[in-house]
Curated annotation (Swiss-Prot):
<feature type="site" description="Basic residue of the functional dyad">
    <location>
        <position position="27"/>
    </location>
</feature>
<dbReference type="Pfam" id="PF00451">
    <property type="entry name" value="Toxin_2"/>
</dbReference>
<dbReference type="InterPro" id="IPR001947">
    <property type="entry name" value="Scorpion_toxinS_K_inh"/>
</dbReference>
<comment type="function">
    <text>Blocks calcium-activated potassium channels.</text>
</comment>
<dbReference type="GO" id="GO:0015459">
    <property type="term" value="F:potassium channel regulator activity"/>
</dbReference>
<keyword id="KW-0872">Ion channel impairing toxin</keyword>
<feature type="disulfide bond">
    <location>
        <begin position="7"/>
        <end position="28"/>
    </location>
</feature>
<dbReference type="GO" id="GO:0005576">
    <property type="term" value="C:extracellular region"/>
</dbReference>
<comment type="similarity">
    <text>Belongs to the short scorpion toxin superfamily. Potassium channel inhibitor family. Alpha-KTx 16 subfamily.</text>
</comment>
<keyword id="KW-0528">Neurotoxin</keyword>
<feature type="site" description="Aromatic residue of the functional dyad">
    <location>
        <position position="36"/>
    </location>
</feature>
<keyword id="KW-0632">Potassium channel impairing toxin</keyword>
<dbReference type="GO" id="GO:0008200">
    <property type="term" value="F:ion channel inhibitor activity"/>
</dbReference>
<feature type="disulfide bond">
    <location>
        <begin position="17"/>
        <end position="35"/>
    </location>
</feature>
<keyword id="KW-0800">Toxin</keyword>
<keyword id="KW-1015">Disulfide bond</keyword>
<feature type="disulfide bond">
    <location>
        <begin position="13"/>
        <end position="33"/>
    </location>
</feature>
Length: 36
């Protein structure tokens, strides 16, 4: 799922995704975080 977190690198999304999905899985796509 795309979340409303801006990013440059995928590792910026891991903590944000952990809060949302409970998993450290995500990547930066079009400067926005996508969680798995």
């Amino acid at each position: 799922d795309l979340i409303d977190v801006k990013c440059i690198s995928s590792q910026e999304c891991w903590i944000a995704c952990k809060k949302v999905t409970g998993r450290f899985e995500g990547k930066c796509q079009n400067r926005q975080c996508r969680c798995y």
